Regions:
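A well-ordered secondary-structure block
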Residues: 92-168
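C-terminal motif of bacterial Sec signal peptides marking the signal peptidase cleavage site
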Residues: 19-23
Length: 168
């Protein structure tokens, strides 16, 4: 029994040493499992809590779709700051969303979205209204993934956008 314990201790020490040498700390490399510390975890939690309160499904964070949401938000900011016209806004929108393939934006800056309207998504971070995500609960239930984006402007205002994606 003593010999078994010694062998077990040596094996465990070897495993520990190997883990340290290979820098294996057990953390994930999946970008969707690591949310940026910019308020994104709180947004995802708020959206999922509101959905649960309404009896709706949950959405999972996606780094890929957050990048799409950010590109759409930047395009929206250019339009609202009169740097591009309506035609250019929609050309850019189509280019950004073409990368999605069969994935559809079902809530947020959809193809039905009108950039001049004020539905509080996108909006400045302080005036963002989560209720805007639940206007049509049937479309919310189509979503599996959430994209969250923030873009700071030169005047210090941070804008936020949330898009929900149907990936199936």
């Amino acid at each position: 029994m003593k010999r078994f314990k010694k062998v077990l201790a040596l094996v465990l020490a070897g495993v520990l040493a190997l883990a340290m040498l290979t820098a294996c700390d057990g953390t994930t490399t999946d970008p969707d499992k690591i949310m940026p510390e910019d308020g994104t975890p709180e947004v995802v939690m708020t959206v999922n809590n509101m959905a649960a309160n309404k009896g709706l499904g949950q959405v999972k964070y996606s780094a890929k779709y957050s990048a799409v949401t950010k590109a759409l938000l930047e395009n929206w900011l250019e339009y609202t700051n009169n740097k591009i016209n309506n035609t250019t806004y929609w050309e850019n929108y189509r280019k950004i969303t073409a990368e999605l393939g069969s994935v559809k934006i079902v809530v947020g800056m959809t193809s039905d979205y009108r950039p001049g309207t004020s539905d509080h998504n996108p909006a400045s971070k302080t005036s963002f209204k989560y209720d805007s995500l639940f206007k049509d609960e049937s479309t919310f239930n189509l979503a599996e993934k959430i994209g969250v984006a923030y873009v700071p402007t030169s005047n210090g205002t941070v804008y936020q956008a949330v898009c929900l994606f149907d990936v199936n």
